[in-house]
Design a protein with these regions (language model features):
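A ligand-binding cleft/hinge motif common to bilobed small-molecule-binding domains
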Residues: 93-106, 167-170, 196, 201-222
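A conserved helix-loop-strand patch within extracytoplasmic ligand-binding domains
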Residues: 115-171
Length: 304
């Protein structure tokens, strides 16, 4: 694939953020110079927040590995998977579904770390109060959404589409029972805004983003309410390509993993990163934790 085609998957605004640290070495490259380690993340929230967080992460990865590390923003969830597949990206912050999709395209890829909240993650169904839907406590309550408009987040979002759609099916509500075709807002922030403005009566959203939005007083709880919190599931995680060590030097994957697992909220530098991730710490994970996500994705035709 040409470099022009490869770059088309990356967001050009501002270019990639490149961080370099001295003291390390890796294999690959010409003249003994290791190539740049590319990282990215699914664009699940406001780009301003992502552009604050991931350059910080790139800097920490550079310091831990001694490599040149570049954060490469992408335009959408599909672009993350594609960039990972073709090798533009070697480490990516994935959702459960995008991680499963990426592993299916790059066998041998490994989920190396997740946030403490990702082992028991939840989606929320929220609604504009003008819709007249009362909160409920069981999946069967989703039948109350019949005749109402609904938006998901990104088409390949785990918490904003895959699992909400799974629970709609489990609750016995066919999408044809909704008013019109479900929307796809593109991100959790956009879903909340769509419900706030009553562009859609109901939205499926990531609980962590909702909680943060409420804490920042960016949503009026007199007009938007939570209808239901789904059961938990595994979601976000860092995914490493199988050629990470052969490209950048033996031990690179372990150095990155150790850095993530060692982030300490009691240290100011680490807390700044953890706060933007909405977590208290990172914990270990493994590919099998996403077996449920894989099964649901296959059932919904989202894993080609």
């Amino acid at each position: 694939m040409s470099s022009v085609t490869r770059r088309s998957f990356l967001l050009g605004a501002g270019g990639a953020v490149v961080l370099t640290a001295c003291g390390g070495s890796g294999s690959g490259g010409t003249g003994g110079t290791p190539p740049s380690l590319g990282i990215t993340a699914i664009p699940d929230q406001n780009p301003e927040l992502l552009n604050r967080l991931y350059p910080m992460v790139a800097a920490r990865f550079a310091k831990a590995t001694g490599l040149t590390v570049s954060y490469k923003p992408v335009t959408d969830y599909t672009a993350v998977v594609r960039a990972f597949e073709i090798g533009d990206i070697h480490l990516a912050w994935m959702g459960g579904l995008t991680g499963v999709q990426a592993r299916s395209r790059v066998p041998g890829s490994t989920a190396i770390a997740q946030r403490d909240i990702d082992a028991d993650f939840h989606s929320l169904f929220i609604a504009n109060k003008s819709a007249g839907i009362s909160p409920f406590t069981d999946v069967s309550g989703l039948s109350a959404l019949a005749g109402h408009t609904l938006t998901f987040g990104s088409e390949t979002s785990t918490s904003g589409r895959l699992m909400p759609q799974y629970f709609l099916m489990k609750g016995g509500l066919a999408q044809s029972a909704l008013k019109g075709t479900p929307g796809f807002s593109g991100s959790h922030d956009a879903t909340i805004e769509a419900v706030r403005t009553d562009s859609f009566e109901v939205g499926a959203v990531n609980e962590q983003v909702w909680t943060k939005t409420v804490a920042a007083a960016k949503v009026d709880l007199s007009s938007v309410q939570v209808l239901w919190r789904t059961p938990g599931y595994h979601d976000y995680h860092w995914l490493a390509r199988p050629d990470l060590d052969t490209t950048f030097g033996a031990g690179t994957q372990q150095k990155v993993t150790d850095l993530l697992l060692g982030l300490d909220a009691a240290k100011a530098e680490d807390k700044a990163v953890l706060d933007l991730f909405g977590a208290k710490k990172f914990i270990t994970t493994q590919n099998s934790n996403y077996d449920q996500i894989e099964a649901v994705a296959k059932a919904q035709g989202l894993l080609g």
